[in-house]
Amino acid sequence: MKVISILGSTGSIGRSTLSVVELHPDKFSIFALSCFDNTDLLFKQTIKFKPSFIVTKDQFSKKRLKDKLKDTKLDTKVLCGKDGYNFIASHDKVTTVVAAITGSAGLISTIEA
């Protein structure tokens, strides 16, 4: 079983990756998802894939997601910023990182992986 963190799960590459994961639940498990701005889609993805962690860009988005998650039974932890992206990219449980953040924004996290 491959344990995956997706850096940029709300973009086209991230969404395509999740489509493949959904087709092969016996081969893949989602450890973490992340986004920059699209917290509504990230929340929907969290409900569907139940990751251990989600990451967004800042404290405001983090609080918004934490508030939305209170109404669920999920134990997903919400992180934010560079430290959050680096954490999910380099966690020991992760076997595969999908670096789907465009440009230099995802460079440090990709190097951490």
Give the residues covered by each predicted segment.
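Glycine-rich nucleotide/cofactor/substrate-binding loop typically near the N-terminus or early
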Residues: 31-83, 89
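Short glycine-/acidic-enriched loop or helix-start segments at secondary-structure transitions
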Residues: 16-17, 42, 65-66, 107-110
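N-terminal Rossmann-like dinucleotide-binding module
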Residues: 1-54
